[in-house]
Each structure stands twice: as C-alpha cells, then as structure tokens.
Regions:
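Compositionally biased linear targeting/interaction segments
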Residues: 2-3, 11-290
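Glycine-rich phosphate-binding loop
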Residues: 8
C-alpha cells in the first residue's frame, strides 16, 4: 500500500513539474511576443513620426523660401533668391546642412544638366556620364537612345531619368550616379555658382574652369567675375541667383526610423501661382531600407 502510494505521489509530482514547465514556457512565449509586439509598435510609431517630421520640415522650407527676399534677374527671364536673405548655413549646391535635427540638401535646378530634349545635342550628357565612370561607348549609346526616342517612334520628351534608364538599360547603380546631376525641368538659364563640378566640366575647360572654381570658392562669382574669367560681355542665359526651380531632399530620423522626402518645385512669389510642385517622392522609410 505504501509502495503504491509512493508511486502515485511520484507520478503526481512529475505531472505537476510538467505542467509547471509548460506554463513556464507559455509565460515566456507570451513575454517574448509582448516584447516583440511592443518593439514593432514602437517602430511603427517612430516611422510615422519621422515621416511627419520630414514632411513638416519640407513644408517649413517651402514657406521660408516663399517669404525670402527675391531679386529680379538681369536677364529678365526669371527671378532669383537674394543670398543674403537666408541663413548663412543654407546653400543651393546640394551640400547637406542641419536645422533642428533635420538634414536638408537644396539644389538649384539651373545648376543641373537638363536631359536632352528633341533635337538637342547629347554630347554634354555623354561627357557627364564619362566623368561619373561610365565607359565612353556605353555613354554614347545612352545618348543615342535619348536622342532617337524623342524623334521616332515615340516622338515624346523624356519624363525622368528612370525612363531613360529603362530605355537604355541603365543599371540602378548607374542611375543613382547620374541622377543628382540631371533634370527634366525646363531651364533656359545656367547658374555656374550652383552647378556641381561634373556639370561645370561639361561646359567649361582649362583656365576658364579653374577661374570659375576659384571665384566660386571665394564667394565672388558674379556677372563681372564671370565676364573677366571668360573674356566676354554679358550673357543673358547665365544666372547667378538660385531659382525659381529648386530640388531639395529632407531627411528626418526618429529612433530607428528614417524618412526622406524629395521635392522639385517652382517658387515664383510674384506670379499668379507662386508655388508650383513639379515632383515629389519618398526615398526611404527606415534606416534598414537605405
């Protein structure tokens, strides 16, 4: 009787220990699940806040540019932003600066290389691609495709760099290299003060290029300096104030989330439509995505 009672007690103890182990594993699983859900919820909150912060900062930037002091260009073709009307840290050459924990990069579209339109020469595009490390034969083929597509059979202008990339078979890496330097926004003037160096090299060489870079480095590139370096008089298609077309990128981070908003806009404070969005896109939503 005692042996039977002992065996029953042993079985009961095993059952209790097994039940305790199962309950322990269940509690552990619930704890891990709760932790995972909490982490995921926080990630979603951070992503939403980062996106809101980036969009709000982009809107603030738009308002600031709309209310900045503008000056009339001598060419009478556009207006420009007076450099001394904005904070000193600002620039229009895509050099990153930070304000209130948000990163900004603003590029004057007049300093970029327009993708060739119908009937236009493709040599500047080919030259730019070679500077960016793309083989000459490959660059020339892209130029040929850009020209031919707009003549026959489509007879349409290129919509963006991604369309050209698809037509010419450019890789994602090649598009990423080319994209910061080109635009499809129509521009009738060129701004050597805001142009990236590779774009400058598609228009100027030798001592002219060196002289312009020296003046720009000293913050002294204006109409008089330009004329002195190139040995020519005024040029109505050369501009020295940024605008009215601008492209900017705003990057905001909250926790592990990162949101990037990129916009291209026309800002013309004295026109009937002072603010005209051209394009906007979200580049990435988190650090992992970049």
């Amino acid at each position: 009787m005692n042996n039977r009672s002992t065996r029953q007690s042993g079985v009961a103890l095993v059952l209790v220990l097994s039940l305790a182990a199962v309950l322990g594993l269940l509690v552990l699983q619930l704890a891990l699940t709760a932790k995972s859900q909490t982490s995921r919820a926080q990630s979603l909150i951070d992503r939403a806040e980062a996106d809101l912060l980036a969009r709000s900062a982009s809107a603030d930037l738009s308002f600031c540019l709309l209310t900045a002091t503008w000056v009339e260009s001598k060419s009478q073709t556009s207006d420009g932003i007076a450099a001394n009307s904005l904070p000193a840290v600002w620039n229009f050459r895509s050099e990153i600066f930070s304000l209130n924990g948000v990163e900004f990069a603003i590029q004057d579209v007049a300093g970029l290389l327009p993708l060739p339109r119908r009937g236009e020469a493709t040599l500047p595009l080919v030259s730019l691609m070679e500077q960016l490390g793309i083989e000459k034969a490959r660059a020339e083929e892209v130029g040929r495709v850009a020209y031919q597509y707009q003549v026959d059979p489509a007879n349409l202008p290129l919509q963006d760099i991604y369309e050209l990339g698809q037509l010419a078979g450019l890789s994602a890496e090649e598009i990423d290299r080319l994209r910061p330097f080109v635009t499809v926004v129509p521009s009738f003037t060129f701004n050597p003060g805001t142009a990236p160096v590779p774009v400058l090299k598609t228009r100027y060489q030798g001592s002219a290029l060196e002289g312009l870079l020296a003046l720009r480095g000293d913050g002294a590139l204006d109409a008089a300096g330009y004329a002195s370096v190139l040995g020519i008089g005024g040029d109505e298609f050369i501009e020295f104030y940024p605008g009215p077309a601008l492209r900017w990128q705003v990057v905001a981070e909250v926790g592990d989330a990162r949101s990037t908003v990129e916009s291209t806009v026309l800002i013309r404070p004295y026109e009937y439509e002072p603010f005209l969005p051209w394009a906007q896109r979200r580049v990435a939503s988190s650090k992992e995505a970049t």
